[in-house]
Amino acid sequence: MTFPDTTSSAAPQATAHAKINLFLHITGRRDDGYHLLDSLAVFAGAADRVTLTAPSNTMSLTIDGPFGQGLEADDQNLVLRAARALQAQAGTTIGGLTESFHLELQKNLPVSSGIGGGSADSAATLRLLAREWNVDQAALFPIAETLGADVPVCVAQRPTRMQGIGEILAPAPVLPDAGLLLVNPGVGVSTPDVFRAFAAGGGIVERPEPFLPDRWNTAQDMVADLNATTNDLQAPALSQCPVIGTVLASIESLPGCLLSRMSGSGATCFGIFSSPESAVAAAHVLNAQSARLGWWTWAGGFHHTGAST
């Protein structure tokens, strides 16, 4: 393989878009402790980026970007774990793949924030190396399942209904050209602590499985259906991180907001608006109101195009 100069924009790269849970229902728990879920996962334009910069004697990683500080580029990093898992699998199935590379992770998304950052980075690494090694994308999903519950849906990187522990993926409704605002208060939330609070608060609620249409024509149509759903982890996360309530109230008060909700196990929250332009305008208002708080915000549209980018 010929690698371009590391300063060239032609260096092989893949984007790791933020995953948003428009709803998240906890439906059961397996004997091994893993929770079962039913969730509608979509992706925002906001993204990390993984780049292959040069051949290397071993898989290696550097991390930069606004949220790169404090992240370890060690063997436990999901980017390196994904690279080595695919290297081992591909070397077995298509023969003799022993190339190693230096990878760069540009970390633009907050960490431990409920938007699948580490999982998305892992999935982007799988897609990137699969392209370089001519590995079929379908072969990535069994590897993704070993790396984390959110990694398979991030490999697909398109609107998807997730069930099971995240390994059962089904088509989602076609999304409207709605606007999306993401807000993170700069506070990390422990997912295990949130699940413990969920269990302490009463745990699983029996409910009918939400009906999802084939398509939503407008943001208003989408929100009408989402209003019949919830995020079961929102209240437990609030008990662990009360500022989430402040964020949700701030989003809900913005002009044009149709729905405010927390994503995943928090602490990132989102607002849905009628158009990307409305979301951007609302973000300007919120940034002026919260400038001293240091909140991270992003506004724009949904990422629709799937895993190839």
Curated annotation (Swiss-Prot):
Binding sites annotated in the UniProt record for ATP: P110, V111, S112, S113, G114, I115, G116, G117, G118, S119, A120
Single GO term (MF): 4-(cytidine 5'-diphospho)-2-C-methyl-D-erythritol kinase activity
Gene Ontology terms: biological process: isopentenyl diphosphate biosynthetic process, methylerythritol 4-phosphate pathway; terpenoid biosynthetic process
Pfam families assigned to the protein according to its UniProt record, in alphabetical order: GHMP_kinases_C, GHMP_kinases_N
Positions annotated as active site in the UniProt record: K19, D150
Keywords of this entry: ATP-binding, Isoprene biosynthesis, Kinase, Nucleotide-binding, Transferase
Enzyme class: transferase
The enzyme's E.C. designation: 2.7.1.148
Reaction catalyzed: 4-CDP-2-C-methyl-D-erythritol + ATP = 4-CDP-2-C-methyl-D-erythritol 2-phosphate + ADP + H(+)
Pathway connected to this protein: Isoprenoid biosynthesis; isopentenyl diphosphate biosynthesis via DXP pathway; isopentenyl diphosphate from 1-deoxy-D-xylulose 5-phosphate: step 3/6
Function: Catalyzes the phosphorylation of the position 2 hydroxy group of 4-diphosphocytidyl-2C-methyl-D-erythritol.
UniProt family annotation: Belongs to the GHMP kinase family. IspE subfamily.
Protein name: 4-diphosphocytidyl-2-C-methyl-D-erythritol kinase
Gene designation: ispE
